[in-house]
Amino acid sequence: MGLLSYRAATEADVPLLVGWHADPEVLRYWDGETFTDDEMHERLARPDVDMWILEDGGEPVGLLQSWREPDPPKRGGLDGFLIASARGRGIMPAIARRLATDLIADGWTEVTVDPYEWNERAIRG
């Protein structure tokens, strides 16, 4: 495992995100939803959700979304996925903790993560 980081997803990431969401190994963690380029551009523009590209040693390996509740206080949750080759190495818990810590430092009062009940690996993380 290299240096773990996250960065804001940009319009340049749309082809990557569309491709990831078309992967059956990702689809199972995303309610089977696939997206066109236009739909992904719309998703990036949502005011209540920020999308983050997860990187391992500078290579993109997954996505986290931070979503906000509409009413104060500032609170919300995280959800996301890793590509198959990045799973099982502690990447998601490490980056999710870092992002949650940064959100709290930015004034969030609560950050939740609610993996699927069948996703035992995520629950253990």
Predicted regions located by residue number:
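Conserved active-site alpha-helix within GNAT-family acetyltransferase domains
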Residues: 89, 93-94, 117-125
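Amphipathic alpha-helical recognition patches that constitute DNA-binding helices
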Residues: 16, 39, 77, 81, ...
